[in-house]
């Protein structure tokens, strides 16, 4: 049996997105300021997933425009070699959040080719005088014929964008890391 992973961000497990239950697969402190958690449906693996939810939480201030620009440029750089790469930016009506959604494709030497659709939601917050920055992302992969996969994902885009916009982000509290003494 898989050992239960404990959420460093105090997020309930499982979470539900787009009528699918996602279970915490990994929770890591990547640096002094970055905590990352990845959730996948029950019978999937990080190596070969169809859907993935990612929470990347920075307990420091990050400039929203910079984070958005970096994500957009990452996709734009792929566009030269990846004919399925395409990126869009959407600002929330109140201007407090941004969504970056994009398509990309991979044709690995070993393994199945896939097209992946990602939505990143960027949100700044503050707790106890401490500024924080959160990226919530959802990825959906379809393996196999790239043209079919791209068409199929494109048809889901509006629904998935609405689902992400309406998604109630859980309250995040960084668990006190044990110092190991």
For the regions a language model picked out, list residue spans one by one.
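Sec/Tat-exported extracytoplasmic proteins
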Residues: 26, 75-82, 164, 168
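Secretory pathway targeting signatures of secreted, lumenal, and periplasmic proteins
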Residues: 20-60
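Short N-terminal edge-element motif at the start of the domain
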Residues: 2-26
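Sec-dependent signal peptide cleavage junction
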Residues: 1-5, 175-181
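Mid-chain, structured segments of secreted extracytoplasmic proteins
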Residues: 49-90
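Hydrophobic/aromatic beta-strand elements that line small-molecule binding cavities or substrate pockets
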Residues: 38-41, 86-90, 115-126
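Short, hydrophobic/aromatic-rich segments at coil-to-beta transitions
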Residues: 93-101
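Short, well-structured beta-strand
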Residues: 101-179
